Amino acid sequence: MAFRTICVLVGVFICSICVKGSSQPQARVYLTFDELRETKTSEYFSLSHHPLDYRILLMDEDQDRIYVGSKDHILSLNINNISQEALSVFWPASTIKVEECKMAGKDPTHGCGNFVRVIQTFNRTHLYVCGSGAFSPVCTYLNRGRRSEDQVFMIDSKCESGKGRCSFNPNVNTVSVMINEELFSGMYIDFMGTDAAIFRSLTKRNAVRTDQHNSKWLSEPMFVDAHVIPDGTDPNDAKVYFFFKEKLTDNNRSTKQIHSMIARICPNDTGGLRSLVNKWTTFLKARLVCSVTDEDGPETHFDELEDVFLLETDNPRTTLVYGIFTTSSSVFKGSAVCVYHLSDIQTVFNGPFAHKEGPNHQLISYQGRIPYPRPGTCPGGAFTPNMRTTKEFPDDVVTFIRNHPLMYNSIYPIHKRPLIVRIGTDYKYTKIAVDRVNAADGRYHVLFLGTDRGTVQKVVVLPTNNSVSGELILEELEVFKNHAPITTMKISSKKQQLYVSSNEGVSQVSLHRCHIYGTACADCCLARDPYCAWDGHSCSRFYPTGKRRSRRQDVRHGNPLTQCRGFNLKAYRNAAEIVQYGVKNNTTFLECAPKSPQASIKWLLQKDKDRRKEVKLNERIIATSQGLLIRSVQGSDQGLYHCIATENSFKQTIAKINFKVLDSEMVAVVTDKWSPWTWASSVRALPFHPKDIMGAFSHSEMQMINQYCKDTRQQHQQGDESQKMRGDYGKLKALINSRKSRNRRNQLPES
């Protein structure tokens, strides 16, 4: 029965390997939630065992706090350790609003609560906070104190309407930025969720929004993110960029397609004087493309923008915009990461405008006269120093913006292809954060990619010779135990920490765990982690300012042969030899699991003192990711097996297994229905002398039986030791008699 169970498990194991086998790259290190906690490089926070839809909405590195919104709660967590010194404010929706929400047919659990979706810094002492308010948005001011040591965290003002500042539906994303105590938001402004707007509120000036119900401006948008980005040296030329995806009808107006878009407005826009009153007069948008071009020409688009990260530099024009995209097709599923130069984005907004012409409303480049100042220009900036406000714009400029908000050219990524593509995986990317790391052999971008399965992949971008960047998955970490999709992610390069949220809670993870790679120079070098280097004693954090020349690191090639000379490389050529026994005609498994799934495995077999030869794989001998499966063991399988792993042209012996084959009849007689741990105590009850047993087997056979029984005994230490030995004495006696006669005929003189 046990053997049958083993066979079934082995079959399932093989099938799982076949199913999971894919050309998609795998993480070099995978840590489960519990394994990650054991490394002492992560922390976890949750208010309760019930899901509360946590969102990390603001990170303040000056006050060492991160601010989290959840259902009915506002949280202030310690940026150094989120599980310590947590502050919270209970801020539920009013009972009346909750009852009205339920009567309107909304979800009592996931809709009829106050889901906090906006937390922005208002001034040195207060935050501005908004929540969905059970489909009746509310906002308030929250006192956080002047210093983090004050331990102040409370609402000290009355609530006000959040309409135009936060979406009614908590499942519809709200994005926002705060500039000079003015709130710029992208959200849906009504209960039914039909009026989308980019809105400026909380202002001493007039409130301004996008043109209402104008599909040229916004067409069922789903907002993703918003950022303030400088444009030149004049601060008046800065723009607020909104990233979103929207549903657009094709030329036949029959089907809707999802396109990812970037829109921008000037923060000092006060609307038009006669047209577009209290509407944006600087609103422009452009399509954001992330696609793979097939060999025969057509493009495969990753249409749906999921998240955006801006990797800033000293020069704003060299800022990189990272975006995560997924496919909208039900047949073709995948994720991609595309990277854009901010200068390319600004070039598109300074380029030709789109214009629909002809009966099919075909988009063409606008060929008419462009009014002055150029539509989309900010008042009071470098190009319009004499215009203090948009109300001074000529009417033709305002009219042009209303009818031509779309740019003709699309925005393409660097090299016009994605940096990372994942197809046919059981996950999709949801969030992204990027860190710039200085290593011994150059500067690298390290991507942290959150998935819908509660994991974070740590990916390093590697330069190649043909202007195409490669990528290597260094780690995949289970940051949430129940595989909850990641909803928000913030990174602190200053603290070297990553903060991740899900429906269940918030996790904090260090950007590096150098000690997990191994205790040898080669292990550290093969990891190719730009955060880590071999310091002569261990794999530890690499600091580019260090003066020690013994630091060994090779991110680009990961070659221990050039980096680890003098650090006991010969130890990798040999592994400790172990003895393993198999029973003839049964199935056995020779275990060999390399540290890295990116390593290739080769099995070599050495019989007696012959040369090692590569094991020939077939239906009986199967190589798996965990070792070598030998079905129906034969005598010819006996020998010394070498498991050789090759990674980056570096070879090392992972395992040496001296495999010995036992006769099935002999093992059956000795072990069938016999408890191995009571053999010695029960041998006196046998109807023959113990010397008869010793003489029935050769010396080598007895050694193998002893070792086999020892191994079996260790596997059954937890069994029932009170069970007495039982067996077929007649069968054993017959075997002993036959072995006696055979041994007398083949007896060799003792040396």
From Swiss-Prot:
The keyword Transcription does not apply. Expressed intensely in the heart, skeletal muscle, colon, small intestine, ovary, testis, and prostate. Faint expression ubiquitously among other organs, including brain. Disulfide bonds join 101-112, 130-139, 266-378, 290-338, 514-532, 643-709. Pfam families: I-set, Sema. Residues 28-511 form the Sema domain. Interacts with PLXND1. Belongs to the semaphorin family. This is Semaphorin-3C. The gene is SEMA3C.
